[in-house]
Amino acid sequence: MADESPAVWVRVEALDTVFHEAAQALAGRLGLPFGGEARFALQLGEQGLQLAELGAQAPGPVRVDFVEGASAHRRLFGGGSGQMIAKAVGVQPGVRPRVLDATAGLGRDAFVLACLGCEVTLIERQPPIAALLEDGLARAVRDPEVAPIVARMRLLPGDAIARMRQWPDEPPQVIYLDPMFPHRDKSALVKKEMRLFRPLVGDDPDAPALLEAALALASHRVVVKRPRKAPSVAGPRPGYSLEGKSSRYDIYARQSLKG
């Protein structure tokens, strides 16, 4: 976790006067300042909500977009149920497990699973990032092709460990974890996002507690995404792993998923 509150780092601002009132309301809801000195800004404008680092050498802003860009490409050409993430969570003919993504981030993996037909609940504990997700989902609902997919996605703000320990509903069949890790994918897009997010989010020293809570709740399996050469999260050893070029999925199976 970051050492300081996100409120120290982030302000909310409108990119046009027409969004002034909505941006002020968002700032109030998130408990963030509207304007003033900050390192980052949640900016509300014509294209929705975006997070930007402020300053002359800053990279471009980041938005959640499930309709165009990388998400659209993966939806159309990503490989369907042959993708490693699909195999990791147990997607197979006649089986589309109910998944809890307890470290949702920008929602990319959750969107892939929803594209495959899974019902996915997302938890994101950092309010600025949860706000980006909420905005991306709201815009996606307006697209006729993507709306049926995001209808399978439900966002819950708050702390995932606390929510899992007090889960009020039927347990998810699969819980998916992707804890922040110091060494990640070195692509330009991920580098930009990490530059934006790491000061807010930090690493995840509570990953063992996340895993413990997930193992206590999931009815069928827990899946932990890791960099390929990273150690497993401290705690019980995974039953097996699926390894790709840059990532690895550690799988803690409790019972078989059946159609």
From Swiss-Prot:
InterPro entries: 16SrRNA_methylTrfase_J, SAM-dependent_MTases_sf
Localization per record: Cytoplasm
CDD domains according to UniProt: AdoMet_MTases
Signal sequence region: none
Pfam family, one: SAM_MT
GO molecular function, one term: rRNA (guanine-N2-)-methyltransferase activity
Binding site for S-adenosyl-L-methionine: 108-109, 124-125, 178
EC number from the UniProt entry: 2.1.1.242
Reactions listed under catalytic activity: guanosine(1516) in 16S rRNA + S-adenosyl-L-methionine = N(2)-methylguanosine(1516) in 16S rRNA + S-adenosyl-L-homocysteine + H(+)
GO cellular component: cytoplasm
HAMAP family in the record: 16SrRNA_methyltr_J
UniProt protein name: Ribosomal RNA small subunit methyltransferase J
Species in which this protein is naturally found: Azotobacter vinelandii (strain DJ / ATCC BAA-1303)
